[in-house]
Amino acid sequence: MAKPTSKDSGLKEKFKILLGLGTSRPNPRCAEGKQTEFIITAEILRELSGECGLNNRIRMIGQICDVAKTKKLEEHAVEALWKAVSDLLQPERPPEARHAVLALLKAIVQGQGDRLGVLRALFFKVIKDYPSNEDLHERLEVFKALTDNGRHITYLEEELAEFVLQWMDVGLSSEFLLVLVNLVKFNSCYLDEYIAPMVHMICLLCIRTVSSVDIEVSLQVLDAVVCYNCLPAESLPLFIITLCRTVNVKELCEPCWKLMRNLLGTHLGHSAIYNMCRIMENRSYMEDAPLLRGAVFFVGMALWGAHRLYSLKNSPTSVLPSFYEAMTCPNEVVSYEIVLSITRLIKKYRKELQAVTWDILLDIIERLLQQLQNLDSPELRTIVHDLLTTVEELCDQNEFHGSQERYYELVESYADQRPESSLLNLITYRAQSIHPAKDGWIQNLQLLMERFFRNECRSAVRIKVLDVLSFVLLINRQFYEEELINSVVISQLSHIPEDKDHQVRKLATQLLVDLAEGCHTHHFNSLLDIIEKVMARSLSPPLELEERDLAVYSASLEDVKTAVLGLLVILQTKLYTLPASHATRVYETLISHIQLHYKHGYSLPIASSIRLQAFDFLLLLRADSLHRLGLPNKDGVVRFSPYCLCDCAELDRASEKKASGPLSPPTGPPSPVPTGPAVRLGHLPYSLLFRVLLQCLKQETDWKVLKLVLSKLPESLRYKVLIFTSPCSVDQLSSALCSMLSAPKTLERLRGTPEGFSRTDLHLAVVPVLTALISYHNYLDKTRQREMVYCLEQGLIYRCASQCVVALAICSVEMPDIIIKALPVLVVKLTHISATASMAIPLLEFLSTLARLPHLYRNFAAEQYASVFAISLPYTNPSKFNQYIVCLAHHVIAMWFIRCRLPFRKDFVPYITKGLRSNVLLSFDDTPEKDKFRARSTSLNERPKSLRIARAPKQGLNNSPPVKEFKESCAAEAFRCRSISVSEHVVRSRIQTSLTSASLGSADENSMAQADDNLKNLHLELTETCLDMMARYVFSNFTAVPKRSPVGEFLLAGGRTKTWLVGNKLVTVTTSVGTGTRSLLGLDSGDLQGGSASSSDPGTHVRQTKEAPAKLESQAGQQVSRGARDRVRSMSGGHGLRVGVLDTSAPYTPGGPASLGAQAAPAARPEKPCAGAQLPAAEKANLAAYVPLLTQGWAEILVRRPTGNTSWLMSLENPLSPFSSDINNMPLQELSNALMAAERFKEHRDTALYKSLSVPAAGTAKPPTLPRSNTVASFSSLYQPSCQGQLHRSVSWADSAVVLEEGSPGEAHVPVEPPELEDFEAALGTDRHCQRPDAYSRSSSASSQEEKSHLEELAAGGIPIERAISSEGARPTVDLSFQPSQPLSKSSSSPELQTLQDILGDLGDKTDIGRLSPEAKVRSQSGILDGEAATWSAPGEESRITVPPEGPLPSSSPRSPSGLRPRGYTISDSAPSRRGKRVERDNFKSRTAASSAEKVPGINPSFVFLQLYHSPFCGDESNKPILLPNESFERSVQLLDQIPSYDTHKIAVLYVGEGQSSSELAILSNEHGSYRYTEFLTGLGRLIELKDCQPDKVYLGGLDVCGEDGQFTYCWHDDIMQAVFHIATLMPTKDVDKHRCDKKRHLGNDFVSIIYNDSGEDFKLGTIKGQFNFVHVIITPLDYKCNLLTLQCRKDMEGLVDTSVAKIVSDRNLSFVARQMALHANMASQVHHRRSNPTDIYPSKWIARLRHIKRLRQRIREEVHYSNPSLPLMHPPAHTKVPAQAPTEATPTYETGQRKRLISSVDDFTEFV
């Protein structure tokens, strides 16, 4: 604690002492002084006196000096010491003595100074009056000690100034000057009178001395004078001169400027500036460079330097003239300083400088530039030009306020010394004055060009001048083009081709090009001459040029490229301007230049670039029908020139003829006659370019150029006017292209190819050109055509295979004579192409198209047909290809199988079956056995031997080659109990739970695991329909739509009808009962009065609904009255009642009575007497006895299959048992005679029946009387020796090659291989020897396929649409009336009918005439009820038909699919063998059998069915036929008949006229098109009149038949499809329909539209707005009867439709190709559209029919199960998979299996009849 206290107390003491409050301490110095005061003794004085020797005195003086410095001497001791030694200062004394005394004085002054007093004056006087000028240093030291270095002059004031002056004269040194500085600072007032001489002396010292130290100290003295005294005015000039000189010393520059700045800050500042200006202007100082430089420096620094003195008011204008004068004599240093000074002035105060100041500055600059001519100073030159650059920058920044003209004159005067940037500014400035408002502006432009272009070597400057010239030309050429070109351009630029600067050459060439582009005078040729000289430079590199220098050399040739590209631009402009001769010359110049490339073999990259761009432009040339040339703009729209033609001159063109080829190219439309002089038209013959193109194809070495030419050629070849209006040899073009592909050295000559380049890339580029060249086939030699086809065949092995296939498809259409010879080999080659997704669509569409060209494959052997199937079958694999490809593959297989020659089909069935198994069925199987089928089944090596040999079949019992026998008897055994169709049970038991999904992409394992069952079933159903199709057509060519002749209608009138479900077929049997005969002979007056209505007519129940333009998935029958648009749909399939006269050639109507007389009679027919009423009584009685004889024994069998219907009409030839009371039927010959005899009794010979038998309708042949040899063979004739044991097979079913036995789908053991496929093959193997060629089957196309006429018919189609159109449609239609049916008889097959009969009998008295009750209709359909009286419905009973009020109408015969009559039905029990129920039914039958048998005439249909089907050991219940049990199932059959057995397509057709490409309303408003459009429509199909169409026979796609949608349209058909075209121009354009909605409701709902684009502009997808417009087939008409076909599709369709394909097709084949493209696109669109609803996928009507039949079977099963729930269903659940069980025992023989089945179960066939 003590330490802080002591510390604090110490601080306090210090503060007290500081403030003077503390106790005073004794002064130690005083005490010490008193103690140390030195006493001068006498002895000391004696030793100092003269008594002693000199040396002793000097020694003692030294000792006293030490004492005097440190100790105080006693009072008066100094005086004593001075007196003792003063004598030693005499001059005669030695210097040592003097120096010792002076040292003693210095010591006394230093040690005893404050005690000397007046002695100071004494000592100063001693120094001042020193006898000599020696000892200056010692004296100065004493003076410094006396004055404390000049600070204190006490007692010295009066004599000090004089002493200083004296001393400066003798001893002016730096030491003295330092003392003088202090004297001036501290005692200046004592020096005033002597300042001037002092300054003078110091200035002289500064000027004369060379010591920088002296000068520096002198400057300090002068600074002290200026700062602490007043510099005399008279000393100012010398003072300034001194500083001006001194400032040139580098080390003294700063102190000098500081001193000058101090001076200028005084009142003498302006005087100093003035003096310095005087110095600069004084002629006497002109040679004194340092002085002038210093003056310039000080003035510049003082007035505008970094530390300028703002007190100075001198302006730059006042001092700059002095600067100018200072430069009178050239001096590098002065000029340099002046440049620095004015540069500083300009940079810092540029905004404050006035014009006057700038004038002086420019004078100075000009003088500086002049001095540079004489002064060799790089530094000065650099700084002077930097000064000019600074001024330029001010000009650029608009901060220069002087005269720009004068400045740029300076720059121009010394332009060769100025940098490029300065000259560019100069040229820019000069260019501003070159305009017509300036006098002599053209001369100024000439001078500018002469000065800075011709005589200048710097590229940038010359380029700038060219820019100025270009700008002047651009602005003034409109009025002064003549003068500018004459005076400036040609004179100044004529030397450009020889100019050494390649950049200048390039820009000058570009200028010439720009000028020539707009020049329309004779000077154009002069300009083009210069350009041609530039282009004439050789593009070959020097031989000694090294490879690394090639790039530099190529850059020097850029002017040539500029010239060529410029000519392209000029040509593009000159095409549309006059005179046209300019365009001609440019075109010829270009062609000549490119020819030089190939002549001299230019191979530099720049040469290739020139050719690349030249060809890129020239191949854009287009021509129209008037031969006018044109080019497309940036939007692709071609604008044609009114002045330039693509042909040669008229005389040349008239004399030109084709040198080679079978035909000369047509001259096309004549060239337009010019309205003015002939010279106004220019001729640019395309042949010149064509020859260069040929050179390119033959000699080009750069792949980029060649690829460009090949890519552009196809589009150019579309414009045939280009080729045919001048001598262009397409033969040579074809030859060159083919040589490129065949020559092995083609690849060797090419360079610049990408990595991995191969012949494949070459093919990819050449094939499109060959494709486009196909349209020139008429003008190609046959040899060239064959070469083209050969090259396309060779391309099939490369990546361009898809393009080659498309090209070959076009060849097939356009060059049939060539392709027909190559086609057999080509088809075989196509089998070598791997089945990939990229090849699928082109290949399948090619085969689809080829199938419709029968004249091409009429000579095909079995190998070619097998190749087609080998190509198609792999694409049926749903795990590899999308749904469209699979469906298209099935379509191709079906088409080719139908078109295949009949003898070959049998052997193709197992081949196709195996392919389907390996590609489709096994893809859904996960069992190990499927691996054996993974090998490609369609390999040609796996074909049957009979197909590979393809020999002609021998004549014998069977015309087809022998089939391959089954190797295992168990396979044949299994076939006998299986149906050919893949049953639903087997399908579902074989399908895996994870398969391909509905996506269109190719499936992989992951997608297969997530697929849904609908798509799995779809592909299996496709396989089923394919097998069903082969069963239909393997032994026949009959169509899928049977027709019933009038004789058949007569025979089967009122017949008994039953329908069975056998596998996937519906078998309807109708037997005759004699009703037609009785009606004919008038024996049944009730029938005739009733209009002879059918007793089995279910079509009398009809309903009328308003028709809407709905999508027609299945073609429902439509019949519209003239008053309203009603669709009349009957229960038998929605087919309307016939209105008008019956078409005697209408399609077949099985099972129905053709009341021909009633249908042909007018409405008042019931009032006329019957034919039978005119007969005499005796004759009538006679004929009554023959009624049973006439028609009993006849039966009709109608088989409904997924792929169509087949019908037989047959007669029973077996004689009746002698124990029977029935009368045998009359043979057909006698029946015909009887019918003819009956006609003799008729008085009214104009009845419809008579006409139908004797007078054919218009366009319809008279039905011939059938001879006995052509009748259907009797059953007894079926039994051939080779067919014993196969009696259950019917020869009548030869076209399907199957028996009516159903396989056992419910067996516990299901083999891996589908049994249906084995059954089908077995059926072919066992039935071929059982066929009878005389089995009669009605068909519209039964002629031989080998006949050419039949080939053409197949090409046109197999479904006779034209026969479905009434040929008497113009006749007035008659009203419909419903007549009472035939008397209904009770049936022995169903107890329910008896009850119904009783009820109907009770209601008979309450009926109203004209309404037939549904119950009565049930009986009329079955044809088995009693015939005592007609049954009528009660008045209040609901009816499904509204009878027209006009009166009763005669009903037509009922129809089934496409106009077929629906089958009657019998309600029967079709359940499996159930003993209890069968006993009850048998008991009931036994009660009614006798009476029914007596009342119902004719043969029971069950008798016919059992003869064809029955086998006593068919297997379990699921194999048995199923009899349709009730009316609801009959309606299902009628619904099946509504689904046509052919695919339907509806295509929109629109015409786009000129200017309509973007207007939907204008397009829809078109009512007609061009002539070529009309021809195109004519070829699309057959023109039909809608009002005469029967919609149940002709697919109309929703078109109204009473005129609402027009009167006519076009439709087309072939064997398996129908297409209708919704043609906008044929639809009415209604004024009230402003938006054309009536048209758009059809056109907008069509998936595919054919757009005939005659507008000359591009048509864009979406112009016609619609939700379902997926694809557009765009037809663009070209010249010379050719057309361009392209496809447009929505983005989501791009994977299904190839929009990159463009086809050029002639008018002759346009309709065919467009229709094919539209049909294929529509198939793809249907697949795409149905993808959005995968639960309802119907890619074809065949599948729709198949599914309908399967649903019918399921319904029957469910109803049977419902009626007896105790019984199990026949089949396992639909989605239950039945595992396959491997057999554990050896396969039993046929006899063993038959015996086991017979023992286990003997069938009771009465259950299903």
From Swiss-Prot:
Keywords: Cytoplasm, GTPase activation, Lysosome, Membrane, Phosphoprotein, Tumor suppressor, Ubl conjugation. GO terms for cellular component: caveola; cell projection; cytoplasm; cytosol; dendrite; glutamatergic synapse; Golgi apparatus; growth cone. The modification Phosphoserine is found at residues 540, 664, 939, 981, 1130, 1132, 1155, 1340-1341, 1349, 1366, 1389, 1413, 1420, 1422, 1456, 1766, 1800-1801. Residues 1533-1760 form the Rap-GAP domain. GO terms for molecular function: 14-3-3 protein binding; GTPase activator activity; Hsp90 protein binding; phosphatase binding; protein homodimerization activity; protein-containing complex binding; small GTPase binding. CNS, uterus, heart, skeletal muscle, kidney and spleen. Changing L713R: In chemically induced renal carcinoma. Signal peptide: none annotated. The keyword Acetylation does not apply. Residues 1405-1418 have a biased composition (Basic and acidic residues). It is found in: Lysosome membrane; Cytoplasm, Cytosol. Residues 1078-1136, 1330-1359, 1373-1392, 1405-1492, 1764-1793 are annotated as: Disordered. It is a peripheral membrane protein. Phosphorylation at Ser-939 and Thr-1466 by PKB/AKT1 in response to insulin signaling and growth factor stimulation inhibits the ability of the TSC-TBC complex to suppress mTORC1 signaling: phosphorylation promotes dissociation of the TSC-TBC complex from lysosomal membranes, leading to activation of mTORC1 by RHEB. Phosphorylation at Ser-1388, Ser-1420 or Ser-1422 does not affect interaction with TSC1. Phosphorylation by AMPK activates it and leads to negative regulation of the mTORC1 complex. It is linked to A germline insertion in Tsc2 is the cause of the Eker rat model of inherited cancer susceptibility. Gives rise to a spectrum of epithelial and nonepithelial neoplasms. This is Tuberin. The gene is Tsc2.
